[in-house]
């Protein structure tokens, strides 16, 4: 048979199962056609691909097969093509059937050959079709992605997905050929290439260390290979035309394939050895199951490899070297290595990555046998621990997955402990710079494998300043120095340094040495020779580098701040370091000094003379360390001396070249050594640290002798070892004054040990200082480390009950006995490794201590927790913290917030509430100004003028931000924006570091307030003029806006002062928690996948409707503000175009905020999609969206028809807000099984956190099609509904954020919209909402109002449930049966069963345990479908909230409360008042002993039992709770009653709230007395009954209670009985 003359490509063939069937090369289309037609004769050849691949490659294959068939005139074979939709959704039973139908329709028979052209989905799906069609036909794999090339196409695994999981139905069916055309990768998006590199790295990690080492060094070359274009030239088809990069790429692919092919040949059906290719997949697949399809397979496996490496490290079978190398290699290719990676955190589903969820998914893994999870463990790079997956216990995996950990106190099992610490961070970073600058090769031993050294190495590689390789299994780093030659990175490439301060400071000067390149893409008039861009994370952008930059600029280097003055990021001009005299301020960081010293020998023009100025030099030992290391690398620095021999702070550095020593051993880290030594000290055991002794270069090596020995430890130190033996537990002694200037990083360890030191020496202290004092000085620089460490230690020690005092240069710690420390403390670690490790020392003796951010130790001791367990012998368990927002935050969530606004706007009031709600510190800048200057602002302005005041004000703001970079709210003076310097400072802060909030208030209210205010300086002009001048500046510098409502509109609607104040507090707390992302106000029901609704408001003006909002929102989870329907005239909007003003929308939004705490859905609906907003007004629409972000709106509905760039920009700035990406088709043309809806969904899924697609139902079948579509698209919450009457069924069946209306609304927002009541009724009628039975247990209860309360609530929301009375005074078998019945929905419990019911429950809330009573039973579904019974107490919440809501004045440290009574209700009252934050609680009972006994059960509540109500030890109470029957109290002093006399002095405070727990009569003595006291508000017992019932109702139903209707029913009956 004649064949075409096909140019034979140069191939690499890989054997599998005894056949050379895997052919690898470039540009293979003609070769593939010829080979298939020649070697696989058939009547029909069918090529199947997807639409995405078809665009790039289908035409060339059609041409190749057409030509090949034409060259074979004797053949009658057909060549058919079939194109299917792309993506995982095609890999289904339906997708398989569609291909099979195509084959059958085209009369394909058993001799057909099927070709799969595409990625893994195509290969898996088409392979399974081939395996089953006609009982098996031949097929060919032609993978087009790197992932498919090296993984899914090799080995014969084929499968489809089902709703139960991926690849659950399939077969082993080997392809006849696998053709690997590496030229395909040129058309692959970089992310897809990187996705495949994860599998390549995995294969090398389990099998071949040499290949792994090559991958570590080859990332730039491999990216260059796929970045080149050879498609037009066919370059690479033959070796003669193949570039070096192409050869490398083909080598990488074939080597990876070769390993898998070898393993498959030995174990085709995956009985053991083939499990090895699943390294990273056990955990990776679990992550993928949650995040698919947004996060790719390789990205999930990359995270899985790191985590499974950590599992092996924890089990002691893999060193940190191995984990570090895997992490570095993955990062080199841009793969995520943690679930905290911003790309992962940006996915809404990432909130579902809980430990229990991942462990549950891991149960279903084909590698498992029995309950144990099977994980492939590495023993080193290139070698697995076993030749199969190894069984691992859940607690081991849990500890690795957990973000936090709990240290279990005890005596170290390893006592006496002998260990070494990781390599010194300080020496490791210096050695890397020196070896890179030097000539020759240097082998570094004991290098620290951590985040810090990784970013240093990555930066040096990007600068092409050195080459790195590994020897001895990764124990030795081989550095080939570049002799000081550095190259500008490509344009757009930034050197990202994370929070690595050492790397940032050293590299700042290194980058000045970069060679000039006027042709660089970075060259400009400002930087004619190009520049390097260095940056870091949010905290790094707060850490100072100003003194170093000032010194470099003064020496002629070009350095530019890009955001905040004095901090990264920087543009650093190329061209060299000039040299000569350099003056440097070294009182903040010795790293500035070392940075210049290290680079000075490479000065361009003259020798460097480095002169240190500005006061005492900090951390001199670290400068000495740098000098010693420079000498080792061949350059000796001379430090000048005075005539008397005193050393001066002047250094002469000659111009020279470093000569790399052949080997350099890095000392162990002395700062890290302090932790195990301190564990020995605090637990009374012995620890020896190797490689740290008197000969150490590091100042922290003196910690044991200078601190622990003085505290009472036995210390032995040789040149190379340090041994500490602690005294018996509890016998450490305070040491008075200790100067730690030479070992500043060790101060945190000293602080936690000092916290448990008893009375000792007061050496160096004043005579009146307590003898349990340890005063630590010389550590001021620790305020500008990874966090403000001095403040961090003070704040966290306070949680343990340890008292401290902050000093200018340090702090004092007042030690106390271990047993008196608070237990179960959760320590916030500030993402600071030293904070975490220091508190882990204290945790060894304080039970229940949780370290919230355990991974921050990876900066210097990545395996600290493993070593703490395995080497020291203190157990650590993984803890999952309560979930916080996964949203991408522009800032560190704990970045300090600046408040700006006019004088009189309420900045101080709002700031104080905000700080209290976040648990942060509040600072009024004006008060700080007065404290520092000793003058009132008005006095200062009068004496020195406004200009001087503005300058001083600017400096104070800068100081406050430097001193308080996190967890602080700073309120500024109204005129701060008058200064251009301040405006630049505030704008830069808001762009890069943290929120700047503009507190707004109606201008007329401000004018009225300031007209009567005299304490502050006069403006010298009209206040209104000042306001209108500043107002645009406030908007310019701010990132967010908060409207300070005075409550005028609330008062007009009958709200009490207490309710107005409460609304302000609630909204302030919501706003600041939302914009920080610390506790976003998002719908829990939506997040948890439960049924949820939002109410669509259609009012043109909300203000008149404010009183109706609580009624309208019953049952809703959020409120939709239809911005396009707003109209300041109050007239309904009749149609487009309608563009409401920003100010009007802001006012409406704020009114809504102060009326309801529900999340807001901010919607601007265009005319084409059913609204009134013009489709062409994109600029105006995004101005409104920006307003929503500035006001902290929770959900923003964004139509995907707007321009993609605008949407992407909005998404990048959304913070904790979520985007509902929406599309509405009013025509009815969109079909739920068509291509258009898939296209719209894919677009919406890419940009939105929630997807909303609305169609129009023309028949009832359209609802079923929608249902099927929704079932297949579950990666994100999906709102899918059909409009019109025929579409109402879709609203009933939709579960996520169904838009609902209410009968009281003026119009419905869309045709067919239903109420919550309508939907519940329909669900019940369709069998989707089963009726449940609820009960009240207790006796006597015949006249209880609870049935009326709850049954009214069920009726109003259309719920088919019933609430019954079950009268009983004992727990009977019938009660036991009722609460375990399938229809049991929940129960209220009253006397006498509140305690007796507890043994029947599976779990009891902490508050119910503390109160000692359960009044509510809530059934909860477990993961396995069974039911657990949860008991809680809602009485305390009712007391808490009604007291809080009626307090006019906020709670301060001086606020007091009074509880009358000492029974069970009094316990709930005490718990509620303590939860309010009131620190002094008076307790009165007729029997004082009973009061004292009750007080003793709550020793931390600040309870003071009273003998009389006539006077109070402190301030009079502003909250009074009466837990005494009404008959037991009287206001008649001369009464013969045995009741408690209530004197008028009870209510002597000017305002307050009294809560009466007695149900009858309506007006009790205490309420009557309060009614006579101006400013006091009374809460009746019936109000408490209703309030606690609302919480029960919402806990049982998951729906917001229709409070107004429920309460109206109860009050009506109650009043009729009086």
UniProtKB/Swiss-Prot annotation:
Positions contributing to ATP binding: 901-908
Residues covered by region (Shikimate dehydrogenase): 1331-1618
| Name assigned to this protein | Pentafunctional AROM polypeptide
Family per record: In the N-terminal section; belongs to the sugar phosphate cyclases superfamily. Dehydroquinate synthase family. In the 2nd section; belongs to the EPSP synthase family.
Query: Its function?
Result: The AROM polypeptide catalyzes 5 consecutive enzymatic reactions in prechorismate polyaromatic amino acid biosynthesis.
Coiled coil listed as a keyword? no
What is the protein's species of origin?
Thanatephorus cucumeris
Q: Where does NAD(+) bind?
A: 50-52, 88-91, 119-121, 124, 144-145, 166, 184-187, 195
> Where does it mainly reside?
cytoplasm
State which pathway it belongs to. Metabolic intermediate biosynthesis; chorismate biosynthesis; chorismate from D-erythrose 4-phosphate and phosphoenolpyruvate: step 2/7; Metabolic intermediate biosynthesis; chorismate biosynthesis; chorismate from D-erythrose 4-phosphate and phosphoenolpyruvate: step 3/7; Metabolic intermediate biosynthesis; chorismate biosynthesis; chorismate from D-erythrose 4-phosphate and phosphoenolpyruvate: step 4/7; Metabolic intermediate biosynthesis; chorismate biosynthesis; chorismate from D-erythrose 4-phosphate and phosphoenolpyruvate: step 5/7
Q: How does it assemble?
A: Homodimer.
**Locations listed in the record:** Cytoplasm
Q: Give the UniProt record's GO annotations in the biological process aspect.
A: amino acid biosynthetic process; aromatic amino acid family biosynthetic process; chorismate biosynthetic process
The EC number(s) attached to this protein equal: 4.2.3.4, 2.5.1.19, 2.7.1.71, 4.2.1.10
Task: Give me the ranges of the annotated region Shikimate kinase.
Answer: 894-1096
What cofactor(s) does the depicted protein rely on? Answer: Zn(2+)
Region annotated 3-dehydroquinate synthase, chain positions:
1-394
Residues bound to Zn(2+): 199, 281, 297
Note down the stretches annotated as region 3-dehydroquinase.
Answer: 1097-1318
Record-level GO cellular component terms: cytoplasm
- Keywords on this record? Amino-acid biosynthesis, Aromatic amino acid biosynthesis, ATP-binding, Cytoplasm, Kinase, Lyase, Metal-binding, Multifunctional enzyme, NADP, Nucleotide-binding, Oxidoreductase, Transferase, Zinc
How is the co-factor bound, per the entry? Binds 2 Zn(2+) ions per subunit.
A molecular function (GO) term? shikimate kinase activity
Residues recorded as binding 7-phospho-2-dehydro-3-deoxy-D-arabino-heptonate, renumbered to this chain, are 135, 151, 157, 167, 199-202, 260, 274-278, 281, 297, 366
